[in-house]
Swiss-Prot record:
Subunit details: The complex is composed of two ATP-binding proteins (GsiA), two transmembrane proteins (GsiC and GsiD) and a solute-binding protein (GsiB).
Subcellular location: Cell inner membrane
Cellular compartments per GO CC: plasma membrane
Positions of the ABC transmembrane type-1 domain: 95-292
InterPro entries: BPD_transp_1_N, MetI-like, MetI-like_sf
Entry similarity comment: Belongs to the binding-protein-dependent transport system permease family.
Cross-referenced PANTHER family: DIPEPTIDE TRANSPORT SYSTEM PERMEASE PROTEIN DPPB-RELATED (PTHR43163), GLUTATHIONE TRANSPORT SYSTEM PERMEASE PROTEIN GSIC (PTHR43163:SF5)
Major localization listed first in the record, in broad terms: membrane
Membrane-spanning parts: 9-29, 103-123, 135-155, 169-189, 229-249, 279-299
Native organism: Salmonella typhimurium (strain LT2 / SGSC1412 / ATCC 700720)
Disulfide bonds: none
Ranges facing Periplasmic side: 30-102, 156-168, 250-278
Official protein name in the record: Glutathione transport system permease protein GsiC
Bilayer topology annotation: Multi-pass membrane protein
């Protein structure tokens, strides 16, 4: 197991290097001149040229890339073109709000999604199954921005129960986490149902019932462990989606997180921040997949990595 983990960690290096090259080329192909955006609409050509020189954008592309990659390998992601603050500080100040929002969304999405999926599988083709899958399809189909605006209209504007924007108290997390986790809960419900339906028809489940074990214990002890293996894979992918895909929700609720920072950086063509955020999101997905693979062995001891 240890050798497997070490090999996967070493495999991070070429993957992140490829991502670094691709994101560098991507941001430099974006239309628009960051020097012109920073200098302002009233700036003349001389001022824009001076700003471009200060930002290092007047150098050839290969020189810019060499400067970028050598600094990244040293852990230096540069300075934001807009705020003139180190990129690491910009990301650090926005990381925790996004992380806590992701964790909050993931907790309720997994609990409710798995509960609905298990109930739908146990009472398959009956009203709990139909109701649960109807809710799941609705949650997947409903756009996140529309759901967020609907929740804000009802609970913030009409009823006045919850705040609309900000991240100062636990109440600020309710509406964004519900909006962000709705699609994940729906996916988890459908995936859990599919996995449980397959497990419930296995021989060891029938054997446990024949021995007189209660249905609840059969489902929780014998069914849950075996059904969780594919569900854990989806759980890891969805966690990565939440952590890196909260851009729309953060924009709707004016959430001070990484998603909103990325949108603002793309608008201003803030190359260093865009590059650092994409690298961070890539690293998160790779590490989450590694954790999921390791959890396989914990859930099912029959699985071993060599």
């Amino acid at each position: 197991m240890l050798n497997y983990v070490l090999k996967r960690l070493l495999g991070l290096i070429p993957t992140l290097l490829i991502v670094a090259v691709l994101v560098f080329l991507f941001v430099h192909l974006l239309p628009g001149d960051p020097a012109r955006l920073i200098a302002g609409p009233e700036a003349d050509a001389q001022v824009i040229a001076l700003v471009r020189q200060q930002l290092g954008l007047d150098q050839p592309l290969h020189v810019q890339f060499w400067h970028y990659i050598t600094h990244v390998l040293q852990g230096d992601f540069g300075t934001s073109m807009v705020s003139r603050r180190p990129v690491s500080e910009e990301i650090a100040s926005r990381f925790l709000p996004t992380l806590w929002l992701t964790i909050t969304s993931m907790i309720w999405a997994v609990l409710f999604g798995m509960a609905i999926g298990i109930a739908a599988a146990v009472w398959r083709n009956r009203w709990p199954d139909r109701l649960g899958m109807t809710l799941a399809v609705t949650g997947i189909s409903f756009p996140a921005f529309a759901l967020g605006m609907l929740l804000m209209q009802i609970f913030s504007v009409d009823l006045g129960w919850l705040p609309t924007v900000g991240a100062d108290s636990w109440q600020h997390y309710i509406l964004p986490s519900l909006t962000l986790g709705a699609a994940v809960a729906s996916v988890m419900a459908r995936f859990t149902r599919s996995s449980f339906v397959d497990v419930l028809s296995e021989d060891y489940m029938r054997t446990a019932r024949a021995k007189g074990v209660s249905e609840t214990w059969v489902v929780l002890k014998h069914g849950l462990r075996n059904a969780m293996i594919p569900v854990v894979t989806m759980m890891g992918l969805q966690f990565g989606f939440l952590l890196g895909g909260s851009i729309v929700v953060e924009k709707v609720f004016n959430w001070p997180g990484l998603g909103r920072l990325l949108v603002d950086s793309v608008d201003m063509r803030d190359y260093p921040v865009i590059q650092a955020e994409v690298l961070l999101f890539s690293l998160e997905f790779i590490l989450i997949n590694l954790v999921v693979d390791v959890l396989y062995a914990a859930i099912n001891p029959a699985i071993r990595y060599k």
